[in-house]
Amino acid sequence: MSQTALQKVVEHARAGLEVRESFFEQYSQLVVDVSKALAVRLALGSKILFCGNGGSAADCQHLAAELVNRFKLERPPLPGIALTTDSSILTAIGNDYSYEMVFEKQVQALGQPGDVLVGISTSGTSPNVISALKEAKRKGMVTIGMTGISAGEMLPICDHIISVPSKDTAVIQEVHIAVGHLFCHLIDHFLFEAVGELEPYLSGE
Protein backbone atom coordinates (compact mmCIF):
# COMPACT_ATOMS: atom_id res chain seq x y z
CA MET A 1 0.00 0.00 0.00
CA SER A 2 1.31 3.45 -0.93
CA GLN A 3 2.44 5.28 2.20
CA THR A 4 2.66 8.49 0.17
CA ALA A 5 -0.99 8.26 -0.82
CA LEU A 6 -2.04 7.49 2.76
CA GLN A 7 -0.02 10.44 4.00
CA LYS A 8 -1.77 12.75 1.53
CA VAL A 9 -5.14 11.59 2.89
CA VAL A 10 -4.11 12.18 6.49
CA GLU A 11 -2.57 15.59 5.76
CA HIS A 12 -5.60 16.83 3.84
CA ALA A 13 -8.02 15.55 6.47
CA ARG A 14 -5.97 17.10 9.27
CA ALA A 15 -5.69 20.46 7.49
CA GLY A 16 -9.41 20.52 6.80
CA LEU A 17 -10.27 19.59 10.38
CA GLU A 18 -8.02 22.29 11.82
CA VAL A 19 -9.54 25.00 9.62
CA ARG A 20 -13.09 23.80 10.28
CA GLU A 21 -12.55 23.79 14.05
CA SER A 22 -10.92 27.22 13.93
CA PHE A 23 -13.76 28.66 11.87
CA PHE A 24 -16.58 27.36 14.05
CA GLU A 25 -14.81 28.31 17.29
CA GLN A 26 -14.67 31.91 16.06
CA TYR A 27 -17.78 32.27 13.94
CA SER A 28 -20.57 30.00 15.19
CA GLN A 29 -22.58 33.02 16.33
CA LEU A 30 -22.11 34.65 12.93
CA VAL A 31 -23.51 31.53 11.25
CA VAL A 32 -26.56 31.71 13.53
CA ASP A 33 -27.01 35.44 12.88
CA VAL A 34 -26.76 35.09 9.09
CA SER A 35 -29.13 32.11 9.14
CA LYS A 36 -31.64 34.15 11.11
CA ALA A 37 -31.30 37.04 8.63
CA LEU A 38 -32.00 34.61 5.78
CA ALA A 39 -35.01 33.19 7.60
CA VAL A 40 -36.40 36.69 8.18
CA ARG A 41 -36.18 37.53 4.47
CA LEU A 42 -37.88 34.25 3.53
CA ALA A 43 -40.61 34.83 6.12
CA LEU A 44 -41.28 38.21 4.50
CA GLY A 45 -41.70 36.64 1.06
CA SER A 46 -38.25 37.31 -0.38
CA LYS A 47 -36.05 34.82 -2.21
CA ILE A 48 -32.40 33.79 -2.08
CA LEU A 49 -30.18 33.94 -5.18
CA PHE A 50 -26.76 32.28 -5.38
CA CYS A 51 -23.77 32.88 -7.67
CA GLY A 52 -20.23 31.54 -7.96
CA ASN A 53 -17.80 29.86 -10.36
CA GLY A 54 -16.51 26.31 -10.69
CA GLY A 55 -16.74 24.46 -7.38
CA SER A 56 -18.53 27.46 -5.92
CA ALA A 57 -21.12 27.21 -8.72
CA ALA A 58 -21.70 23.62 -7.64
CA ASP A 59 -22.22 24.85 -4.07
CA CYS A 60 -24.78 27.36 -5.37
CA GLN A 61 -26.78 24.63 -7.06
CA HIS A 62 -26.45 22.33 -4.06
CA LEU A 63 -27.80 24.92 -1.61
CA ALA A 64 -30.60 26.10 -3.89
CA ALA A 65 -31.69 22.46 -4.21
CA GLU A 66 -31.72 22.05 -0.42
CA LEU A 67 -34.02 25.07 -0.13
CA VAL A 68 -36.42 24.17 -2.92
CA ASN A 69 -36.63 20.48 -2.01
CA ARG A 70 -35.76 20.12 1.68
CA PHE A 71 -32.75 19.70 3.96
CA LYS A 72 -33.79 17.41 6.85
CA LEU A 73 -37.14 18.76 7.99
CA GLU A 74 -40.33 18.03 6.07
CA ARG A 75 -41.56 21.51 5.17
CA PRO A 76 -42.88 23.56 2.23
CA PRO A 77 -40.42 24.44 -0.57
CA LEU A 78 -38.43 27.63 -0.09
CA PRO A 79 -37.40 29.98 -2.95
CA GLY A 80 -33.72 29.49 -3.74
CA ILE A 81 -32.30 30.09 -7.22
CA ALA A 82 -28.79 29.32 -8.47
CA LEU A 83 -27.78 31.80 -11.18
CA THR A 84 -25.26 29.25 -12.48
CA THR A 85 -27.53 26.74 -14.18
CA ASP A 86 -29.02 28.15 -17.39
CA SER A 87 -26.45 27.63 -20.14
CA SER A 88 -28.44 29.71 -22.65
CA ILE A 89 -28.58 32.73 -20.34
CA LEU A 90 -24.94 32.39 -19.31
CA THR A 91 -23.63 32.05 -22.86
CA ALA A 92 -25.91 34.76 -24.26
CA ILE A 93 -24.70 37.30 -21.71
CA GLY A 94 -21.09 36.11 -21.98
CA ASN A 95 -21.18 36.34 -25.78
CA ASP A 96 -23.10 39.61 -26.15
CA TYR A 97 -21.61 41.47 -23.19
CA SER A 98 -18.92 39.82 -21.06
CA TYR A 99 -18.41 36.95 -18.66
CA GLU A 100 -18.14 39.54 -15.90
CA MET A 101 -21.85 40.34 -16.37
CA VAL A 102 -23.31 36.81 -16.41
CA PHE A 103 -24.63 37.08 -12.85
CA GLU A 104 -25.13 40.85 -12.70
CA LYS A 105 -27.73 40.87 -15.48
CA GLN A 106 -29.60 37.99 -13.86
CA VAL A 107 -29.71 39.96 -10.61
CA GLN A 108 -31.08 42.90 -12.60
CA ALA A 109 -33.80 40.67 -14.03
CA LEU A 110 -34.71 38.56 -11.00
CA GLY A 111 -33.67 40.46 -7.88
CA GLN A 112 -36.08 42.62 -5.91
CA PRO A 113 -35.48 44.86 -2.88
CA GLY A 114 -35.32 42.66 0.19
CA ASP A 115 -34.18 39.57 -1.71
CA VAL A 116 -30.83 38.03 -0.81
CA LEU A 117 -27.78 37.39 -2.99
CA VAL A 118 -25.19 34.91 -1.72
CA GLY A 119 -21.95 35.37 -3.67
CA ILE A 120 -19.40 32.57 -3.27
CA SER A 121 -15.75 33.17 -4.20
CA THR A 122 -12.83 31.49 -2.46
CA SER A 123 -10.56 34.38 -3.46
CA GLY A 124 -13.06 37.14 -2.78
CA THR A 125 -12.14 38.72 -6.12
CA SER A 126 -14.13 36.88 -8.82
CA PRO A 127 -15.17 39.76 -11.13
CA ASN A 128 -18.60 38.36 -12.05
CA VAL A 129 -19.47 37.68 -8.41
CA ILE A 130 -18.31 41.15 -7.35
CA SER A 131 -20.38 42.75 -10.15
CA ALA A 132 -23.46 40.81 -9.08
CA LEU A 133 -23.03 41.79 -5.43
CA LYS A 134 -22.66 45.45 -6.40
CA GLU A 135 -25.84 45.27 -8.46
CA ALA A 136 -27.68 43.54 -5.62
CA LYS A 137 -26.56 46.29 -3.25
CA ARG A 138 -27.83 48.94 -5.68
CA LYS A 139 -31.20 47.19 -5.78
CA GLY A 140 -31.61 47.15 -2.01
CA MET A 141 -30.99 43.43 -1.61
CA VAL A 142 -29.24 41.77 1.32
CA THR A 143 -25.72 40.74 0.26
CA ILE A 144 -23.79 37.82 1.72
CA GLY A 145 -20.24 36.95 0.70
CA MET A 146 -18.61 33.57 1.27
CA THR A 147 -14.85 33.63 0.78
CA GLY A 148 -11.45 32.58 2.11
CA ILE A 149 -9.00 34.23 4.47
CA SER A 150 -9.14 37.50 2.52
CA ALA A 151 -12.54 39.02 1.87
CA GLY A 152 -10.97 40.86 -1.05
CA GLU A 153 -13.37 43.19 -2.80
CA MET A 154 -16.39 41.66 -1.07
CA LEU A 155 -15.96 43.43 2.25
CA PRO A 156 -17.39 46.87 1.40
CA ILE A 157 -20.32 45.51 -0.62
CA CYS A 158 -21.57 42.72 1.66
CA ASP A 159 -23.89 42.98 4.64
CA HIS A 160 -22.47 39.71 5.97
CA ILE A 161 -19.13 38.00 5.25
CA ILE A 162 -18.30 34.34 5.84
CA SER A 163 -14.49 34.30 5.71
CA VAL A 164 -12.79 30.91 6.07
CA PRO A 165 -9.29 31.21 7.62
CA SER A 166 -7.42 29.37 4.85
CA LYS A 167 -5.77 29.95 1.48
CA ASP A 168 -6.37 26.35 0.35
CA THR A 169 -9.22 26.42 -2.18
CA ALA A 170 -10.38 22.87 -1.48
CA VAL A 171 -10.42 23.38 2.28
CA ILE A 172 -12.30 26.68 1.90
CA GLN A 173 -14.91 24.97 -0.26
CA GLU A 174 -15.32 22.17 2.29
CA VAL A 175 -16.06 24.70 5.02
CA HIS A 176 -18.36 26.67 2.71
CA ILE A 177 -20.61 23.68 2.11
CA ALA A 178 -20.63 22.89 5.84
CA VAL A 179 -21.74 26.47 6.53
CA GLY A 180 -24.28 26.25 3.71
CA HIS A 181 -25.76 23.12 5.25
CA LEU A 182 -26.03 24.93 8.56
CA PHE A 183 -27.79 27.83 6.83
CA CYS A 184 -30.38 25.37 5.54
CA HIS A 185 -30.67 23.60 8.90
CA LEU A 186 -31.07 26.84 10.87
CA ILE A 187 -33.43 28.43 8.34
CA ASP A 188 -35.71 25.45 8.89
CA HIS A 189 -35.28 25.83 12.65
CA PHE A 190 -36.26 29.50 12.68
CA LEU A 191 -39.11 29.21 10.17
CA PHE A 192 -40.73 26.02 11.42
CA GLU A 193 -39.48 25.15 14.91
CA ALA A 194 -38.73 28.46 16.64
CA VAL A 195 -40.98 30.91 14.85
CA GLY A 196 -41.28 33.12 17.91
CA GLU A 197 -37.61 34.03 17.69
CA LEU A 198 -38.28 35.84 14.41
CA GLU A 199 -41.20 37.95 15.67
CA PRO A 200 -39.08 40.92 16.84
CA TYR A 201 -37.55 41.10 13.34
CA LEU A 202 -40.88 40.90 11.52
CA SER A 203 -43.04 43.31 13.51
CA GLY A 204 -41.36 46.42 12.12
CA GLU A 205 -41.72 45.42 8.47
UniProtKB/Swiss-Prot annotation:
Zn(2+) binds at residues 62, 66, 173, 181. Its EC number is 5.3.1.28. It is found in: Cytoplasm. Gene3D superfamilies: Glucose-6-phosphate isomerase like protein, domain 1 (3.40.50.10490). Pathway: Carbohydrate biosynthesis; D-glycero-D-manno-heptose 7-phosphate biosynthesis; D-glycero-alpha-D-manno-heptose 7-phosphate and D-glycero-beta-D-manno-heptose 7-phosphate from sedoheptulose 7-phosphate: step 1/1. It catalyses: 2 D-sedoheptulose 7-phosphate = D-glycero-alpha-D-manno-heptose 7-phosphate + D-glycero-beta-D-manno-heptose 7-phosphate. GO terms for cellular component: cytoplasm. Binds 1 zinc ion per subunit. Substrate binds at residues 53-55, 66, 95-96, 121-123, 126, 173. Its cofactor is Zn(2+). Catalyzes the isomerization of sedoheptulose 7-phosphate in D-glycero-D-manno-heptose 7-phosphate. Belongs to the SIS family. GmhA subfamily. Homotetramer. This is Phosphoheptose isomerase.
